[in-house]
Design a protein with these regions (language model features):
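An N-terminal assembly and electron-transfer interface module characteristic of large anaerobic redox
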Residues: 1-183
Length: 183
């Protein structure tokens, strides 16, 4: 945004650094669409409903900005994933990791790297066939549930899925990436 390469931005308030990014971008006035999505710290039913509402408000805000209707079919197609070959890997946990850092780790360790941070990709446990028949509220609730069911960052309070990771026979090591001043 600051370099003029993007004029639409959705940020997730995963940590204080993202809130500061939002403040800086907002102060420049260079972003035509700027939205902060609130991410809960918990993954209980109440938080899932609240998060689904936040996602729905994002959808409505973007529709109003872009004057385009939400494309449910395109949304659902974004969840199709090809079957991945199982092989040994190093997991990267912690705060977001850039592709450059992922490549550097892989080049130095000579093993596949799985980015298990919040920027690690779309590994969502949703069934596109089921979402096709849902109304919009149910679909966004299923989406919120799937997002909150991903590998939790260390900011999230429920660590059960992190504990399950250690049982993966393909996991050969973990690199925990952190930054100073994360909440």
């Amino acid at each position: 945004v600051l370099e003029g390469k993007a004029d639409q931005l959705v940020l997730v308030n995963c940590c204080d650094s993202m809130r500061r990014v939002y403040d800086i971008v907002a102060s420049t006035g260079k972003c035509k669409f700027l939205y902060m999505l609130d991410l809960p710290h918990e993954d209980n039913e109440c938080e899932k409903v609240k998060f689904a509402g936040a996602i729905h408000r994002l959808k409505e805000a973007y529709e109003a900005y872009s004057r385009q209707q939400f494309d449910k079919e395109r949304f659902i197609k974004s969840f199709t994933e090809s079957e991945k070959e199982r092989k040994p890997y190093i997991g990267v946990l912690g705060v977001r990791v850039s592709g450059v850092l992922e490549d550097m780790i892989q080049d130095n360790i000579q093993m596949k790297v799985n980015n298990l941070t919040c920027t690690g990709g779309r590994r969502l446990a949703v069934l596109p066939e089921e979402m096709e028949i849902m109304d919009e509220d149910a679909m966004f609730l299923a989406y919120a549930d799937a997002l909150l069911a991903q590998m939790p960052c260390f900011r999230m309070n429920n660590s059960t899925r992190r504990n399950q990771l250690y049982l993966d026979p393909d996991l050969k090591g973990i690199i925990y990436h952190t930054i100073k001043f994360c909440d």
